[in-house]
Amino acid sequence: MPFGAVYRATRVAAIALVAVAATPPRTEPGLLSPAGSTSSLPPSALSVWTGRAWREWWRSDAAPDRWTAPHDAIADAIQWKRAADGVEWGELRLAGAGEARRLRAVAVRIDPRLVRLRLDTAFTAGGERAAWTVEGARADAIVAVNVGQFIRTLPWGWVVLDGREFLAPGRGPLSTAVVVDSSGGVRWIGPDGLADPAVRRGVAAAFQSYPTLLTANGDVPDALRSPGRGIDVEHRDARLGIGALADGRLLIVLTRFDAFGESLGSIPFGPTIPEFAALMGALGARQAVALDGGISGQMLVREQNGTTHAWRGMRRVPMALVAFCHPERDVCHPERQRLSSRAAARDLL
């Protein structure tokens, strides 16, 4: 990003922070997260707008160690809208502390059995800089979102593109790999699993990211439950993550600054990592990993009627996960769908 643009964005962010800090909180006590906490996190809380009032649903001093089901307050507050076969999305208004006083979370659920998933990359002609943005997403994308973390111009860790290993696995105790196999199924591999070459066979696409937000049984990692374990549990930023629901669908969540509307939504104010892990769990994720949020986080949802919703970032990124219509499904081929409908109508005569 040019220096002038960075300066302007920083200045706007500073002005916004002052305005948010001057805004009194509007939270009301309500139902807390599930019991069973051994948390020693710094004090913080999250509330959700129900349409009538703010309802507190999570507190750091009562943070659960495990998420086994969606939280009632979150499930009741979000209204899911169908974008296409196998894809639905919704939004939540959240209230936290400090610069997270007003947030919006955009959530997308994807059924990998009903769409095709692939990784897209984009770099400048010489390969010196990353170049992908939601504006450049392929025209047939139903969902497009930046994935992984990256170092300079390249993604961090393991990357498989179209069945070929592009980058070798990275190492880290809180890393998770997300794999799309040749049949279109999605599986998750923990930090120790990639050492086995057999696990890396039959992979169509894969990326690696960190930190893990929820392990396979919905457990919150120890490093996210108290300070001093390798994760900054106080830092606030815009967040992006991907998770797996109990029924195998994918959950993608992007947080946006919401004090002044979407025009300033890309300002990197947001929840802490423990708060974001709680949001993923409260939306039903049983396993989850953070992606590159901050000024990188960006996502697109395109409805079947052509309506496009885009949440833009401030920075170009090297890689994105794209969901598009499954070529074997009639809904991807309007003419085939019309013929099927006519045949079905004839059968009823």
Regions found by a protein language model. Give the residues of each.
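Active-site-adjacent helix-turn-beta-strand microarchitecture at beta-sheet edges
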Residues: 148-234
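Leucine-biased recognition of intrinsically disordered, low-complexity hydrophobic segments
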Residues: 17, 31-32, 41, 339, ...
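Short, solvent-exposed aromatic-acidic interface loops
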Residues: 122-128, 192-196, 254-260
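A short, polar/proline- and glycine-enriched secondary-structure boundary/capping micro-motif
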Residues: 128-132, 197-203, 261-270
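Zymogen propeptides
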Residues: 23-172, 176-177, 185-188
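Bacterial N-terminal signal peptides
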Residues: 12-20
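A cross-taxon signal for low-complexity, glycine/charged-rich
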Residues: 4-8, 335-339, 346-349
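Conserved, well-ordered active-site substructure
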Residues: 154-172, 176, 180, 228-287, ...
